[in-house]
């Protein structure tokens, strides 16, 4: 399961379960996630989850800026469209989020082959 976690001062304030498809973020009421912030455009960004053709129950994730006024940031860099990796920081206006994939094995213990 993909989770979008709202981060405040390094701690998780809330999380949203995501599913396949487009997830819009912006100030307007019609967005999947509405952010009440003057630095956020009406339709600011879209996170897209597409089922991976080779790995069952995993998704390819991308984030697209929708020509917002103040930009969409991933790991402090502005992006127009980018493939997203597990745990990267997304900043929209004053809001910070991280996407987590329960199926991702990033950061798990290293396994060594027998010698």
Question: Where in the sequence are the language-model features?
Answer:
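Forkhead-associated
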Residues: 18-92
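Short, exposed beta-strand/loop patches in secreted or surface proteins that constitute
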Residues: 14-16
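Regulatory inter-domain linker segments that are low-complexity and enriched
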Residues: 1-7, 11, 20, 55-59, ...
């Amino acid at each position: 399961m993909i989770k979008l976690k709202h981060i405040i001062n390094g701690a998780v304030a809330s999380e949203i379960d995501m599913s396949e498809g487009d997830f819009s973020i912006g100030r307007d009421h019609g967005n999947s996630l509405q952010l009440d912030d003057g630095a956020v455009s009406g339709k600011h960004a879209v996170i897209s989850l597409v089922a991976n053709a080779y790995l069952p129950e995993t998704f390819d994730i991308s984030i697209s800026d929708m020509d917002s006024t103040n930009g969409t940031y991933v790991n402090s860099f502005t992006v127009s469209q980018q493939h997203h990796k597990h745990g990267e920081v997304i900043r929209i206006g004053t809001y910070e989020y991280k996407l987590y994939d329960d199926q991702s094995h990033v950061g798990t213990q290293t396994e060594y082959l027998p010698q």
